[in-house]
Every structure is written in structure tokens, then in C-alpha cells.
């Protein structure tokens, strides 16, 4: 059963579900799910993780697959506030980590504005877990002391991009692009890396997609 709140204001947990493998869910995330009255979950959350929630907890699918959002972000923000005001324990379940390109910051802002108690539960980001499961260390003492994580899918309503792909391409260290499959050709064209640079740094290129979700 979820927690009883006696009509008092509830609480919202912004929970990172990790990169897909249910075994990588944190203990704190599991505790939050076990106490949930409502779970609002994303496309990238492994369905098995929902089994930690009470059988009578309401499950609401928010989508978040590329541009296919079951619930637009503004409406989603309002929903989290509404459910919490009703006195419910709400778990907002997100793939990876809520604050790594997960729009958790936007949701936290709206909850704070509405005076809703909330807590951030970090999750393991696919930016490090994906490469690790593929046998790729994102840092190495002998050859890589820098890690750059960037998105391949910026807000389309922005007037100008804040990412300079050409500079990222020339930088040392490991580069991890998230949400970039649909933008792969565009980004690689704008991220020129000379063959001399590749040979000098023994650089390898890898595409990792849905590694821990299937």
C-alpha cells in the first residue's frame, strides 16, 4: 500500500531508474517505489522496475521517446503538482539520472514554485553505464583524464545552439553523446576530427543503443 497522508500535502520523488538493468536500481529508489501512491514513468524505464511499486499504485506513462511525448512537459509538471497537492506520494521515474538530460531540473523548479516537498534520487547514468557494459572505460589513468557528456538533441525552440560540436571534436578525452541516434549524421558532420588526430590518440568510435533495455 502507498502512504496515507490524511489529506495533507504529499511529496514527489524525482527518481533515477538507472540505464535499464533492474539490478542497477539504487536501494533508495526501490524504497521510494515501495511507498508510492502514483508512479509517473518514462519510455526508458524498464517495466520490471515498476514491480517494486504497490500493486494498487496508479501507473501513468509519460512517454518521452524522442518527440513522441504521451504527456507534454508543461502538462506533466502540472500533473506532478496536482497529484502531490492531493496528498499522494508521487514517484516521477526517469531513465538514467533525473539531472542528466532528464528534465528533472524543470520539474523540480515547478514543484518548488508550488511549495511541494520533493526529493531527488540520483540514478546511474547511461553515459557511464552504457560504455562500461560495452567494455569501454570512459576514463583511464594512462590515456584519458577528461570526459565530455553532451546531448545530440537540444531544445528545438532555442534560437541558437549552445553546443559547439567542432570544439568537442578537437578536445581530448572521451566524448559521450546522449539522445543522438536521430542526429548522428548531423553531429558527426559538424564535429570534424582529422585522421591525424585520430591516429595520434588511437581514438575509437562506438555506437551504443538500448544496451541494457533489451
Question: Could you tell me what each predicted segment is?
Answer:
Residues 1-17, 27-124, 129:
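Class I S-adenosyl-L-methionine
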Residues 17-24, 155-160:
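Short gly/ser/thr-rich secondary-structure transition/capping motifs
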Residues 34, 53-54, 168, 192-198:
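Short, conserved loop/helix-junction motifs that constitute active-site signature segments
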Residues 47-48, 66-68, 125-129, 146-149, ...:
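Short gly/pro/ser/thr-enriched loop/turn and capping motifs at secondary-structure boundaries
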Residues 97-171:
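Class I SAM-dependent methyltransferase SAM-binding "motif I" and its flanking Rossmann-like core
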Residues 163-194:
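Conserved anion/nucleotide-ligand pocket segment
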Residues 196-203, 214:
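Conserved small/polar residues in nucleotide/adenosyl-binding loops
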Residues 208-214:
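Hydrophobic alpha-helical segments, chiefly the membrane-spanning helices
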Amino acid at each position: 500500500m502507498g502512504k496515507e497522508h490524511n489529506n495533507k500535502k504529499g511529496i514527489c520523488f524525482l527518481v533515477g531508474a538507472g540505464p535499464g538493468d533492474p539490478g542497477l536500481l539504487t536501494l533508495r529508489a526501490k524504497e521510494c517505489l515501495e511507498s508510492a501512491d502514483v508512479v509517473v514513468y518514462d519510455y526508458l524505464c524498464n517495466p520490471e522496475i515498476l514491480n517494486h511499486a504497490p500493486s494498487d499504485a496508479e501507473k501513468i506513462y509519460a512517454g518521452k521517446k524522442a518527440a513522441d511525448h504521451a504527456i507534454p512537459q508543461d502538462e506533466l509538471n502540472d500533473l506532478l503538482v496536482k497529484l502531490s497537492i492531493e496528498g499522494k506520494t508521487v514517484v516521477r521515474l526517469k531513465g538514467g539520472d533525473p539531472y542528466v538530460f532528464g528534465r528533472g531540473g524543470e520539474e523540480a523548479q515547478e514543484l518548488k514554485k508550488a511549495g511541494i516537498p520533493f526529493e531527488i534520487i540520483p540514478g546511474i547514468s547511461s553515459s557511464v553505464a552504457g560504455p562500461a557494459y560495452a567494455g569501454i572505460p570512459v576514463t583511464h589513468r594512462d590515456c584519458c583524464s577528461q570526459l565530455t557528456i553532451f546531448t545530440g538533441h537540444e531544445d528545438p525552440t532555442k534560437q541558437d545552439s549552445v553546443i559547439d560540436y567542432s570544439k568537442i571534436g578537437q578536445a581530448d578525452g572521451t566524448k559521450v553523446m546522449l539522445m543522438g541516434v536521430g542526429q548522428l549524421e548531423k553531429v558527426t558532420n559538424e564535429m570534424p576530427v582529422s585522421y591525424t588526430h585520430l591516429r595520434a590518440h588511437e581514438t575509437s568510435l562506438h555506437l551504443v543503443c538500448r544496451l541494457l533495455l533489451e
